[in-house]
Amino acid sequence: MAAVGRYSGKVVVVTGGSRGIGAAIVRAFVDSGAQVVFCDKDEAGGRAVEQELLGTVFIPGDVTQEGDLQTLISETVSRFGHLDCVVNNAGYHPPAQLPEETSAQGFRQLLEENLLGAYTLIKLALPHLRKSKGNIINISSLVGAIGQSQALTYVATKGAVTAMTKALALDESRYGVRVNCISPGNIWTPLWQELAAATSDPRATILEGTLAQPLGRMGQPAEVGAAAVFLASEATFCTGLELFMTGGAELGYGRKASSSTLVEVPILPP
């Protein structure tokens, strides 16, 4: 848990803050002394977090709607007078799909939620972040860097989030605004549970997800929250950084072909 006072007096906006990683980020910043304004489409979940955590303000909102994001920023600045950090967390991972099962319409919708919502919020927040020399934290994904089977559209959106982070870090450095991203691997969240439940063997899916990390466990949302507070408060010489929160899942060299892959095995000479 983040230490009290590490981000005291600061104002933070978080998207998708009603559950999972988003709720953990909200909690971590509150524990660090910040005032947190967060949005989510889930109004009941957002109100529950707001009631639980003193120092939070919930504003119902959909990141695919620019008007909702304008309200989020204007209400934050009107209430607190400044803005120090934006965390673009809202996003979605569709169930497993083969490439031929995806659609352009579904891809556009996912781009709106996972990429364009973050872009829009950043544009709206930048005038205020430049004044405070604040920072932006985008939640990307490990698979944006290494790929993932049956997740073509999701991987594309998250790879774009990481690329946008690096480009923006260059542009905003002249204003003293830092821009970083966190790329989680397997974090045990409600979304992970839902995706596992949709598979033919949820227990096997969960075990496979657990064994993907050399550390032998999935990460916890609170660990991502702690990383976000670190990037905002103490990582003052970091910009354009992609911080892997993965338990080492990307490390090592091993089997990649699936059981259905046509394999050509070398033959030893006699």
UniProtKB/Swiss-Prot annotation:
Family matches, as InterPro entries: NAD(P)-bd_dom_sf (IPR036291), Sc_DH/Rdtase_CS (IPR020904), SDR_fam (IPR002347)
Positions annotated to bind NAD(+): R19, I21, D40, K41, D62, V63, N89, Y154, K158, I187, T189, L191
GO biological process: L-fucose catabolic process; steroid catabolic process
UniProt signal peptide: none
Reactions the enzyme catalyzes: L-fucose + NAD(+) = L-fucono-1,5-lactone + NADH + H(+); D-arabinose + NAD(+) = D-arabinono-1,5-lactone + NADH + H(+); L-galactose + NAD(+) = L-galactono-1,5-lactone + NADH + H(+)
One GO term describing the cellular component: cytosol
Any one GO molecular-function label of the UniProt entry: identical protein binding
EC primary class: oxidoreductase
Keyword Transferase part of the UniProt annotation: no
Name of one Pfam family that matches: adh_short_C2
Gene3D superfamilies: NAD(P)-binding Rossmann-like Domain
Keywords for the protein's UniProt record, in alphabetical order: Carbohydrate metabolism, Fucose metabolism, NAD, Oxidoreductase
EC number: 1.1.1.122
Influence of pH: Optimum pH is 8.5 to 10.0.
Entry's family note: Belongs to the short-chain dehydrogenases/reductases (SDR) family.
Annotated function: Catalyzes the NAD(+)-dependent oxidation of L-fucose, yielding L-fucono-1,5-lactone, which rapidly converts spontaneously to L-fucone-1,4-lactone. Does not use NADPH. Displays low activity on L-fucose, D-arabinose and L-galactose compared with rabbit and human. This is consitent with the low L-fucose metabolism observed in this species.
Protein name per Swiss-Prot or TrEMBL: L-fucose dehydrogenase
Organism encoding this protein: Rattus norvegicus
